């Protein structure tokens, strides 16, 4: 009868009740919200992007906001975007992590990040509209089946100012080409093979003028974007770099020329520490020269002017193109729609590192992490038993550690924290810290029993001493982990968050409850 009263009193103790409430709340949280996993467990992609030039912290925050909107518009979920910025050098890095995506989706996301999203509409060498003049309405994209089964389109409207400028420069020029660019290589030196140079000056880029002669594409590029096109005729790497430097170019683009030349130019730029970006393009299998040129320039069109803008009102235009399959056509349309809808980035980003983990491999990591956690609990149970030779001590210690894990996971589900391998390592570290503190409590209680001290004040003093040690240890751990939380970006944050969470749950919830449970169990002896 006395034992039943003791159990009832224990269960009604406010410290034990608090533990029970936290456990129930955590189980409910995990059931309703569910756990979310980082890319190293759930699978996904991690990309590190670097701005093309140094930016301020405010500009960097603006880029992150635009990227978030762009990826949300694209339909991506479970996005984490973090930034590192050095105010002295201006060097910045953006870390993008996206869970639960396929390899194809990962490649599309990389393209989205590297697309600055600056739209230009040019007519005969004059830019008459940019992205700020464009309005893209919701879901105004898809397949253009009237053109072909695998053709796509993205519709948009021009502002009145851009429309008026277009009227002035295009009046009476039916059939002339309209060029639309998305992120053209502005202020670059473009060195192309003779056949590509001939293609760029051919009728493929001249439209179908009813009267007059439009400027060739090479001339339009020079006037609109300061892109200088040079025909390759056995120039050396030194000649090309010297030419680009003299013209004040930002980029050198080598198209359909020997790869050895590209390697030589790149090495020369690196050796001289020049602020020039070097890129190399070669035609893909089955790609004709017109499509190759359009890919280099990020050119859509050229479209033919089919109406006299001075005689009619039309503000709705569209980007269009084709792809090998319907699925790829829809993907391309959705990508461009996402870029235009979210707006352009302040500077262009270049992905300097990427890591993809398949969901299958992530599931294997999750299984290993679960096994490691169970192994840690069993190890705790056995070590505590061999130390005290009492199951009534070992089982509560291991159970309390399990309760801590459940509560940590419940809170993680509630705040939608992505669990990754460092986070799980933090949980295991918190278990180790918790066991240390429970041993301190147990030793104090056993010390009181060994000395046959029965007075309540003595027991309270021993508990006060134990919790002083526990709180001091917890404070030290929290301070140390706070530095990781504040000053580091990436996986170390997950370790810091779960460790701090585990320590706080321990000192505020599970440790006081364990002390009451241990006092009751030891009193039975």
Swiss-Prot record:
Pfam families membership: SecD_SecF_C
Membership in a protein family: Belongs to the SecD/SecF family. SecD subfamily.
Record bears the keyword Transferase: no
Subunit structure: Part of the protein translocation apparatus. Forms a complex with SecF.
Isomerase found in the keyword field: no
Species the sequence originates in: Thermococcus gammatolerans (strain DSM 15229 / JCM 11827 / EJ3)
Assigned keywords, A-Z: Cell membrane, Membrane, Protein transport, Translocation, Transmembrane, Transmembrane helix, Transport
Main subcellular location: membrane
Cellular component GO terms, alphabetical: plasma membrane
Compartments, record wording: Cell membrane
Protein name: Protein-export membrane protein SecD
Topological relation to the membrane, as annotated: Multi-pass membrane protein
Highest taxon listed in the record's lineage: Archaea
GO BP terms: intracellular protein transmembrane transport; protein targeting
Segment forming the signal sequence: none
């Amino acid at each position: 009868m006395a034992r039943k009263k003791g159990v009832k009193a224990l269960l009604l103790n406010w410290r034990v009740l608090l533990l029970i409430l936290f456990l129930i709340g955590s189980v409910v949280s995990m059931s309703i919200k569910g756990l979310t996993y980082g890319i190293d467990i759930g699978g996904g992609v991690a990309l590190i992007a670097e701005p093309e030039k140094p930016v301020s912290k405010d500009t960097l925050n603006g880029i992150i906001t635009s990227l978030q909107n762009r990826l949300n518009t694209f339909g991506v979920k479970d996005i984490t975007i973090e930034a590192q910025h050095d105010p002295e050098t201006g060097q910045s890095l953006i870390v993008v992590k996206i869970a639960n995506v396929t390899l194809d989706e990962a490649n599309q996301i990389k393209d989205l990040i590297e697309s600055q999203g600056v739209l230009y509409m040019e007519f005969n060498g004059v830019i008459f509209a940019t992205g700020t003049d464009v309005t893209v309405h919701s879901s105004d994209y898809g397949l253009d089946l009237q053109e072909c089964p695998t053709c796509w389109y993205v519709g948009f409207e021009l502002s009145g100012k851009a429309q008026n400028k277009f009227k002035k420069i295009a009046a009476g020029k039916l059939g002339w080409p309209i060029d639309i660019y998305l992120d053209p290589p502005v202020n670059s030196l473009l060195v192309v093979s003779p056949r590509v140079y001939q293609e760029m000056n051919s009728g493929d880029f001249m439209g179908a003028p009813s009267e007059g002669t439009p400027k060739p594409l090479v001339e339009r590029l020079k006037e609109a974007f300061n892109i200088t096109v040079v025909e390759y005729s056995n120039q050396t790497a030194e000649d090309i770099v010297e030419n680009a430097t003299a013209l004040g170019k930002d980029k050198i683009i080598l198209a359909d020329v020997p790869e050895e030349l590209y390697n030589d130019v790149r090495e020369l730029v690196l050796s001289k520490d020049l602020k020039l970006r070097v890129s190399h393009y070669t035609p893909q299998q089955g790609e004709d020269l017109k499509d190759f040129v359009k890919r280099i320039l990020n050119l859509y069109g050229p479209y033919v002017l089919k109406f006299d803008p001075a005689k009619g009102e039309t503000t709705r235009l569209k980007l269009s193109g084709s792809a090998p399959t319907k699925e790829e056509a829809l993907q391309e349309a959705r990508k461009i729609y996402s870029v235009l809808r979210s707006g352009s980035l302040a500077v262009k980003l270049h992905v300097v590192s990427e890591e993809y983990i398949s969901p299958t491999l992530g599931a294997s990591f999750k299984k290993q992490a679960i096994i490691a956690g169970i192994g840690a609990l069993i190890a705790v149970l056995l070590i505590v038993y061999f130390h005290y030779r009492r199951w009534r001590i070992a089982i509560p210690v291991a159970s309390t550690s399990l309760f801590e894990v459940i509560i940590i996971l419940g809170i993680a589900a509630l705040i939608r924290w992505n669990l990754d391998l460092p986070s799980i390592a933090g949980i295991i570290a918190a278990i180790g810290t918790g066991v240390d503190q429970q041993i301190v409590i147990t030793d104090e209680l056993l010390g009181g029993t060994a000395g046959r001290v029965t007075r309540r004040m003595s027991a309270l003093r021993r508990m006060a001493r134990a919790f002083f040690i526990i709180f001091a240890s917890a404070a030290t751990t929290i301070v140390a982990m706070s530095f990781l939380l504040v000053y580091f970006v990436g996986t170390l944050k997950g370790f810091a968050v779960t460790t701090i969470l585990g320590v706080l749950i321990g000192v505020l919830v599970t440790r006081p409850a364990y002390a009451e449970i241990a006092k009751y169990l030891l009193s039975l002896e």
